[in-house]
Amino acid sequence: MKRNGTRLNFAKANSTKSGSTRARDLMNKMSIIPEWHSLYSNTRKLPCSRPHSSPCKMQRTIFQDLCRPSSSTTAIANPVLSYLDIERILAQKISSRRDDIKKVFQILDRNHNQMVTKGDLKRVITAFLIPLTKDQFQDLLAQIPISSLGNVPYLEFLSRFGGGIDININGIKRVNENEVDNRRTVKEVQLTEKIFRNMRSIRKVFQVMDVNNTGLVQPQELRRVLETFCLRMQDGDYEKFLEQYNIDKTTAVDYNAFLKNLSVKNDASFKYLLSNAAELSRETQQGKNGKRLLDTGSSEDVWKNYSLDDLEKTFCQEFSKSYEKIEKALSAGDPSKGGYISLNYLKVVLDTFIYRLPRRIFIQLIRRFGLKTSTKINWKQFLTAIYERQKLEVSKTLPLKKRSSTEARNRSRKENIIKKLFKYSEDRYTALKKTLLIISSTPSGHITWEELRHILNCMVAKLNDSEFSELKQTFDPEGTGAVRVNSLLDVLDDSTKVRKMSPSTDTKTPLPVAWDSVEELVLDSITRNLQAFYSMLQSYDLRDTGTIGKNNFRKVMRVFCPYLSNEHLVRFSSKFQEAGSGRILYKKFLLSIGVGIPPPTPPLSSPKVQLSDQFQIEEPGQQDERTQPSGEKTSEINNMTKEEVIDGLKHRIQQKDPVFRKQFLSISKEPDVKINQEEFRKVLERSGMPMNDCQYAMLASKLGFKNEEGMSYQDFTMGFEDCMLSGLETVPLQSRTASRTNMDEHFISAEECLRIFPKKLKESFRDVYSAFFRIDLDRDGIISMHDFHRLLQYLQLNMVDLEFERFLSLLGLRLSVTLNFREFQNLCEKRPWKSDEAPQRLIRCKQKVADSELACEQAHQYLIMKAKTRWADLSKNFIETDNEGNGILRRRDIKNSLYGFDIPLTPREFEKLWQNYDTEGRGYITYQEFLHRLGIRYSPKVHRPYKEDYFNFLGHFTKPKQVQEEIQELQQISEREKLMNHYEEISKAFNAMEKSKPVALCRVQKVLQECGCPLKEEELISLLKSLDVSVHNNHIDPVEFLRALEISWASKARPKEKEESSPPPISFSKVTPDEVIKTMQEVVESSQPALVEAFSALDKEDTGFVKAMEFGDVLRSVCQKLTDNQYHYFLRRLRLHLTPNIHWKYFLENFSTFQDETADDWAENMPKAPPPMSPKETAHRDIVARVQKAVASHYHTIVQEFENFDTLKSNTVSRDEFRSICTRHIQILTDEQFDRLWSELPVNAKGRLKYQDFLSKLSIERVPSPPMAAGDSGESTMAQRGSSAPEFSQGTRSNLYSPPRDSRVGLKSRSHPCTPVGTPPLQNCEPIESRLRKQIQGCWRELLRECKEKDTDKQGTISAAEFLALVEKFKLDISREESQQLIVKYDLKNNGKFAYCDFIQSCVLLLKAKETSLMRRMRIQNADKMKEAGMETPSFYSALLRIQPKIVHCWRPMRRSFKTYDKNGTGLLSVADFRKVLRQYSINLSEEEFFHVLEYYDKSLSSKISYNDFLRAFLQ
């Protein structure tokens, strides 16, 4: 003891001590400390200013610290810890202190029902295990079943979290009963000793029981604690114990004073125990290899006197002692068998079994082992790195002895020999030293002279006989035939003449080393360390390809053959380099040098055993055996007998060893494929069980293995288990007829397979994709049920064919079904389908199936399965119906369904599939025909066309009760329509009744049923309520009921009368040229008001003239299907085909009187040209043109100028401020010119310019088109012209700002369609909504409630006046003009109603675009994927970027709305319908931005928009 303490003090004082001495002192210090820590694990960190002179004194200090009250140190929970970290910590700590914690729970379990309260559980966890936050504790409670009273079963808690690392804590040696003080009984001594052992636990139990922190416990509770943790005592013994420590059993006990008094009274015995513990530790330290070492704390002050080299050596030495436990613990932390664990888990394991290192030093050590600390740790690579480091960095230092004069002379002589030895080459010194270090790590530490000469000839130079004899005489004067390697290393280290050798003046060149000698030396080095060499190569080849990188190959060769020069390495690399990739074929390299591929290392083998196996160097007396070839010797050592192999196989089969199974299946590929005897022998060799021919023949005979029949893995496991049960009698495995019960044990039922399949899949594969990739052998992205069956066999889920079919039926599958990856993933994970995911066809194209017939059959079977099980999903693309309302299917419907379920077909394959359905070639099929082809019976209630649920879109704001009410209302509407269809029968039946008396509901129900309207009682009551018919005591007034029916009938019949009264539209498609003029006169006469309005909109100056092209556009808008030939014929007849400008007023007034006989006179009387303008008018128009051109070319600059002047943010500027802007950007205007320009601008009541209106009117010109002629289909062909720089011609308007009228009209020959009459323009209200968002988010519930109260019809709309009243009531910060913009935007049905649901949704839901990097911004659909793409402008891009979140949020219902308007299924919409859908979903687009969108998606001016191209731009 004294010697150890002196050594520790000396290590502290002498900072210049060598690294090896420090390491030994550290080992001595660490070997003493754990003996006391085994008594008190997890103690607090103790300050250590200097090493203690004796462990007794140090441990007494620790004990005194433990006996102090711990209230001063409050445990703080770590909120960063995840649930997995907490579970791991609990598993570790509970496994080490299970008994103590169980005893604590038993004390707290006063009712003895194995239950504790949640508060008791949390206090026990905080005191004994780890402090938790409230959320962490709630997460932990969620994993435990809780009783109805809220109590927790603590046994369930211990069972659930009691796994993990098995930490065995050894206590100190018990006191011999003969050495007990005579004044105390044996019971008292035993009780005292047990209190010492459980001091910390007992203190924590007292604190747990002391809920109020008073420091007191009741005497009966004190006895319960002592009897639970220590031993049971009789009443007499317990009373003596209380007298010994002055405890009154009638009052509360101060447990802190009790523990302190206990420590003082037993101080002498305590010292004795500590001295015994220290002596035991010092005496048994060298003999115990597997003992764990724990330091006194994690403070870096304890470690600062030790270098990293010393810590690394000591760490490696202690690591080998607990290798098996560490490997088991690391394997337990890798449940997925992926080979990776977290850095924190690795530190917990190493702290448990080796040292509790500070984190900074731990990370430095990990980096020295070649591992990255920023990612997860490959624990197998970590074990290999430590094993290699331990093998190569064995401690070389030996204790120095006093040299005699003879020894000095011998050393001088040896140094002279070494100097002569290295006279040829100095750079060989380091390589020779590394080689000798490897040899010195062997158990014997000797090398024969023949081996040494061989090494010197290869590495240094070829020695002649005289030089070698001199070397041999110097180091081996006794002639033993071998030399100690350490003696050579000693001379190499201490010879300053060798280490500081001056440059040689000898001109003699070094002797070259022969290549044959180098190959022999490499072969010898690799043979000695074959397993380690091959393991290190495999660590760089995780996929077992047989190749590694050139740099990695050099690293491995440098480790095991450090004497190789760069030339040698280049020669080796080039000789075995793969041509294509440049990688090294290391297996070919091993075979070429005659080594061969070694069998894999058996699992859980200790590095110490591996070291002894790899460095088999015998004692000097065994020189004859050393001269034998290394290959024969290795085979003799490694070959196993028949009994050993049978034991090994038995162990592997019982443990279901995955390594052995993988080796077997690597040859057989499948569990049911048979292999022959030679292949089975390879399996044994790869599994670390090599055998010679004789032993293997005996094993095959014992197992009954027949080469002609072969054996599969299933046969082997089943038969080998039978052999184990019967004592391995000689019965052939394949011919064994097992009993029925034994066979049933290996086959499971379909229900059991369904239950354990997800768990097995998770254990065997890293993820679902790995399993899919494993069974998809042809890599076509589709697996069959045969592939699925192979997967079950791979997971050892064996079923008979009948059960497998039942298993598929439970999953909703059949034998003929195929699955793609997404379906397989949903099958395995049961994850919900994301509604906002884009269809797979819009993301990427799938691989095509090569076989056309197989592809069609697979698609057909897939449609059968979906039609049976998921018709609702399949029918999402089936929306078309015929005139009678029956559902029909076209090519695109089935194609979209297949693509939606990721079943892609080539056009040829799909055409073949469609021909099987549409046998008559009509282009469509009915639902009945489609289901008949699928072999499914048609049901009208089930197989209906898909209908979109309107309320799903507003579900964010709609409560479930409200949804139910609205659905009931829709049902009532359909029931009311049924009543209207049978109005006459119902009216006759009720008129026949006696109207003076009320009618019972049951009679009303019966009458309606007789009239063809069967209704349930609940449906009838709700229908009467919707008709405002009162019900009293289940009776109604028949007169009131008839009056309500009459009102509904009249309102329904009125629209039909209007439709019947409207004349059919006139079509010019079948009009002959001779009838064109007459037909045109009829159309012009009937469409006179619309033509006047359209021409007036074009003739801003009221000159009566329009351009000939504009004149033709207007006529085409009212004349359906008017061809160009008919129009040109019409102009020639009117003598107007050469006229650039046409007087439209004259045409409308006199066209009805036109005749061919007076055509010349009629044309001559028409005015020819507009009147000339005055010079002032011309100058003014030029100024207006300059203003518009300046705004178009410097838009952002002018906007910035306006905003700079608008300091009050009122969107207005003064007259002088606007004039300064005109002077700067346009031209200097005279007072007269500016006054005239100012008079045409939008000015408010205060005389300030509203610059927002000014800019919008200049940047875009909107024109309301004339009303359609009677009978028009509603598809507007009118167009809107707008751009950033409008063109000006002779007919430029005189007024810059004219609110009631817009700029001009054009048709598809010049511009895009415009807003039809009655359709409000698009509005961009995003700035208004952004400003209102904060205000409405605080009161949107009250606002929604008010709107619902005003919405009596529950249509989701209120009147504009009611909305303005709510704006005033909630004091929303918007002006009158902004309110009008909102009303226009949210008037979705053009009926003057405000859609409050859409408004609130836009203001409450803050939709943001997905945050992506600059390299992955939103891309617009490529032009090559579209037929024609227009110009890409900044305004176009800014508009798309702004509306992207809204489109992504509602693109699915929007697409279905597009399809509803696209009745012909062409994928194209008219501009009017496209605008309607955008308004329906409240898309924030101004008219200018809408024009840019049209300009891009309708470059050809066809007035048709591809809505798929539009949506695809947002979904990429």
From Swiss-Prot:
Region listing for Interaction with AR, in residue ranges: 1422-1516
Residues annotated as binding Ca(2+) 4: D1462, N1464, T1466, D1473
Biased composition (Polar residues): 12-21, 628-638, 1274-1297
Pfam families given in the database record: EF-hand_11, EF-hand_5, EF-hand_7, EF-hand_8
Annotated positions binding Ca(2+) 3: D776, D778, D780, D787
Modified residues (Phosphothreonine): T906, T1315, T1319
GO molecular function annotations of the record: calcium ion binding
Keyword Mitochondrion: no
UniProt-annotated stretches for the region Interaction with PARK7: 1318-1516
InterPro entries in UniProt: EF-hand-dom_pair (IPR011992), EF_Hand_1_Ca_BS (IPR018247), EF_hand_DJBP (IPR015070), EF_hand_dom (IPR002048), EFCB6 (IPR052603)
Protein's cellular compartments: Nucleus; Cytoplasm, Cytoskeleton, Flagellum axoneme
S-S bonds: none
Binding-site list for Ca(2+) 2: D210, N212, T214, E221
Keywords: Calcium, Cell projection, Cilium, Cytoplasm, Cytoskeleton, Flagellum, Metal-binding, Nucleus, Phosphoprotein, Repeat, Repressor, Transcription, Transcription regulation
Binding site for Ca(2+) 1: D109, N111, N113, M115, D120
Stretches assigned to the EF-hand domain: 96-131, 197-232, 321-356, 444-462, 528-563, 674-690, 763-798, 905-940, 1086-1121, 1193-1228, 1229-1264, 1348-1373, 1374-1409, 1454-1484, 1485-1516
Chain positions found as Phosphoserine: S1265, S1311
One GO biological process term: flagellated sperm motility
Residues covered by region (Disordered): 1-23, 618-638, 1263-1318
Oligomer status and interactors: Microtubule inner protein component of sperm flagellar doublet microtubules. Binds PARK7. Part of a ternary complex containing PARK7, EFCAB6/DJBP and AR.
Function in brief: Negatively regulates the androgen receptor by recruiting histone deacetylase complex, and protein DJ-1 antagonizes this inhibition by abrogation of this complex. Microtubule inner protein (MIP) part of the dynein-decorated doublet microtubules (DMTs) in cilia axoneme, which is required for motile cilia beating.
Matches recorded under PANTHER family: EF-HAND CALCIUM-BINDING DOMAIN-CONTAINING PROTEIN 6, EF-HAND CALCIUM-BINDING DOMAIN-CONTAINING PROTEIN 6-RELATED
Entry protein name: EF-hand calcium-binding domain-containing protein 6
